[in-house]
UniProtKB/Swiss-Prot annotation:
Part of the spliceosome which catalyzes two sequential transesterification reactions, first the excision of the non-coding intron from pre-mRNA and then the ligation of the coding exons to form the mature mRNA. Plays a role in stabilizing the structure of the spliceosome catalytic core and docking of the branch helix into the active site, producing 5'-exon and lariat intron-3'-intermediates. May protect cells from TP53-dependent apoptosis upon dsDNA break damage through association with PRP19-CD5L complex. InterPro entries: Saf4/Yju2, Yju2. Residues 236-246 have a biased composition (Basic and acidic residues). Component of the spliceosome. Present in the activated B complex, the catalytically activated B* complex which catalyzes the branching, the catalytic step 1 C complex catalyzing the exon ligation, and the postcatalytic P complex containing the ligated exons (mRNA) and the excised lariat intron. Identified in the spliceosome C complex; in the complex interacts directly with PRP16. It comes from Homo sapiens. HAMAP family: YJU2 (MF_03226). It holds the Pfam family Saf4_Yju2. This is Splicing factor YJU2. GO terms for molecular function: metal ion binding. The gene is YJU2. Zn(2+) binds at C43, C46, C80, C83. Keywords: Metal-binding, mRNA processing, mRNA splicing, Nucleus, Phosphoprotein, Spliceosome, Zinc. One of its GO terms (biological process) is RNA splicing. Residues 278-290 have a biased composition (Low complexity).
Length: 323
């Protein structure tokens, strides 16, 4: 800044700018520029979508031997964000747009292609009519025929609209609403009838059960008592057995008599005539033989089991038989 404002540059009197040598650069040299994708595209290599407005560091070059009205055409090189494949496109000053050249396909291009096709057909038709007068008559005949078909279709649409105009949509909706309400009312009545029938059936069943219970509670006195069936004992459920404790198994029950005690019949001792006459019985002499019953008395304990009593009874019978 100080040099521009304060100091002056010196130009010698023999200064000639044409004599200064210029740097020779190739015409197809490339520059690195920062740009955004001008349209939506899809990579042909990996199928990755690249949307419009995505920024790239692109290489820019001038297309050789392609000029439109003196305007140069530029080519740009970018790389796919996924597979790093090279994609190229160039400017189109004729249509103020860009054209895809290599590496990708342009999306949403159907409308543009259709417009280009229409322009091409129109141009070919104009070229044919320019050199062939008969072609002009044929094209006019085709146009008039197409126009008549369009008018017929338009008339059909008008008739259809008129027929639909006479239809009262409000009345149709009202009728549909009434039919729906009637159907809902009928369904509600059927539900009520079914509920009433179920309640009536339940009430009758309850009355029958009450009458049966009254009949069972008050039997008729004239009816004779039924005798028990002899085989009814087989149908009875078995009674639960009392759990026998360990001490009862070893010692025996003290409070109740065992069931086999009924089988043991205790004999009554015969009255001795000597004792009945009042004379005392003589004491046995020492060394005299005594019967087995007196030698081996079997005292009965109140807590003895039934099996021990039965064994003692059998021993007493054997001793009596031997005597």
């Amino acid at each position: 800044m100080s040099e521009r404002k304060v100091l002056n540059k010196y130009y010698p009197p023999d200064f000639d700018p044409s004599k200064i040598p210029k740097l020779k650069l190739p015409k197809d040299r490339q520059y690195v520029v920062r740009l955004m994708a001008p349209f939506n595209m899809r990579c042909k290599t990996c199928g990755e979508y690249i949307y419009k407005g995505k920024k790239f560091n692109a290489r820019k070059e001038t297309v050789q031997n392609e000029v439109y009205l003196g305007l140069p055409i530029f080519r740009f090189y970018i790389k796919c964000t996924r597979c790093l494949a090279e994609i190229t496109f160039k400017t189109d000053p004729e249509n103020t747009d860009y054209t895809m050249e290599h590496g990708a396909t342009r999306n949403f291009q159907a409308e543009k292609l259709l417009e280009e096709e229409e322009k091409r057909v129109q141009k070919e038709r104009e070229d044919e009519e320019l050199n062939n007068p008969m072609k002009v008559l044929e094209n006019r005949t085709k146009d008039s025929k197409l126009e008549m078909e369009v008018l017929e279709n338009l008339q059909e649409l008008k008739d259809l609209n008129q027929r639909q105009a006479h239809v009262d949509f409000e009345a149709m909706l009202r009728q549909h609403r009434l039919s729906e309400e009637e159907r809902r009312r009928q369904q509600q009545e059927e539900d009520e009838q079914e509920t009433a029938a179920l309640l009536e059936e339940a009430r009758k069943r309850r009355l029958l059960e009450d009458s049966d219970s009254e009949d069972e509670a008050a039997p008729s006195p004239l009816q004779p008592a039924l005798r028990p069936n002899p085989t009814a004992i087989l149908d009875e459920a078995p009674k639960p057995k009392r759990k026998v404790e360990v001490w009862e198994q070893s010692v025996g029950s003290l409070g109740s008599r065992p069931p086999l005690s009924r089988l043991v019949v205790v004999k009554k001792a015969k009255a001795d005539p000597d004792c009945s006459n009042g004379q005392p019985q003589a004491a046995p002499t020492p060394g005299a033989p005594q019967n087995r019953k007196e030698a081996n008395p079997t005292p009965l304990t109140p807590g003895a089991s039934s099996l021990s009593q039965l064994g003692a009874y059998l021993d007493s019978d054997d001793s009596n038989g031997s005597n």
